[in-house]
């Protein structure tokens, strides 16, 4: 993996539970002594795992990186639910289970297109106000239209265990961006005729980035190396340019390439990211210039 100092790139963090994604951004700003830090793909406060951060010019890549699928491991308790749909909330309903629910029978119904209504405790905004703000104030939470998502993989990773008329098990999920794992667990329980909440959510992947390359937040400091801009876009097709084409790329002028890629990262002969171009009609136009 290429690294660079001073920092212009991507940092993959293993977010701990108990803090927000924005808290992570502030911690990294202080630790790396830089103001320009952003994140792609918000993680719940009570969730942990992969959080992709852009450092300085790396913030320009976040919109591209946030389009990718996300992968999770999560634990669910069936038979009891909370107002937040996770273990940190207040219990609002209990439906003791008399037998082990047939979870595997309903999992296939979630694969493919899946319409999900965001939970009341979410950062979705209505009239400039987040849904969780309405909920915390005890006000009626506005109705939000369901969103169409895609679930690529959903399966159980542990046996179902029964204790005190509740069922416990863990799952693997790979889905499109924007999914609320807490709500998925609740929807899964509804198909089984019961209620549920998540007891743990751990994001193990975001696009090409995995938990194995994530750094613990408390290990970040001013000397921490970051992933280069080009390496961060590891799946994006590229063209290496020089001479007149390099001049045009640095100045955001149209470029002409054969091929069908809708997006291209433009590199100089040293492999440094110069720009990102998008196909438009018969040529490619600059979307972001980094040179």
Language-model features: where?
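Acidic, low-complexity central loop/insert segments
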Residues: 64-118
């Amino acid at each position: 993996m290429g690294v660079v100092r001073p920092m212009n790139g991507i940092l993959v963090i293993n977010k701990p539970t108990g803090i927000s994604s924005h808290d992570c951004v502030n911690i990294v700003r202080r630790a790396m002594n830089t103001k320009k830090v952003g994140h792609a793909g918000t993680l719940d406060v009570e969730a942990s795992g992969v959080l992709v951060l852009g450092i300085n010019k790396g913030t320009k890549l976040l919109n591209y990186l946030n389009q990718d699928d996300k992968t999770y491991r999560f634990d669910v308790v069936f038979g009891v639910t909370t107002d937040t749909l996770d273990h940190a909330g207040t219990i609002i309903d209990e439906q003791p289970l008399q037998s082990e629910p047939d979870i595997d029978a309903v999992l296939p119904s979630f694969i493919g297109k899946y319409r999900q209504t965001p939970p009341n405790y979410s950062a979705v905004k209505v009239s400039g106000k987040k849904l969780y703000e309405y909920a915390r104030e005890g006000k009626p939470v506005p109705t939000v239209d369901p969103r169409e998502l895609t679930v690529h993989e959903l399966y159980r990773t542990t046996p179902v265990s029964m204790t005190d008329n509740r069922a416990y098990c863990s799952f693997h999920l790979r889905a499109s961006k924007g999914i609320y794992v807490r709500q998925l667990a609740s929807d899964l329980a509804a198909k089984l005729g019961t209620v549920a909440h998540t007891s743990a959510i751990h994001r193990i992947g975001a696009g090409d980035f995995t938990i194995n390359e994530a750094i613990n937040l408390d290990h970040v400091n001013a000397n921490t190396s970051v992933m280069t801009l080009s390496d961060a876009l590891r799946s994006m097709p590229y063209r290496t340019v020089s001479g007149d084409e390099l001049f045009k790329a640095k100045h955001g002028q149209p470029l002409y390439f054969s091929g069908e890629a809708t997006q291209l990262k433009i590199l100089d002969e040293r492999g440094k990211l110069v720009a990102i171009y998008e196909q438009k009609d018969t040529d490619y136009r600059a979307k972001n210039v980094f040179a």
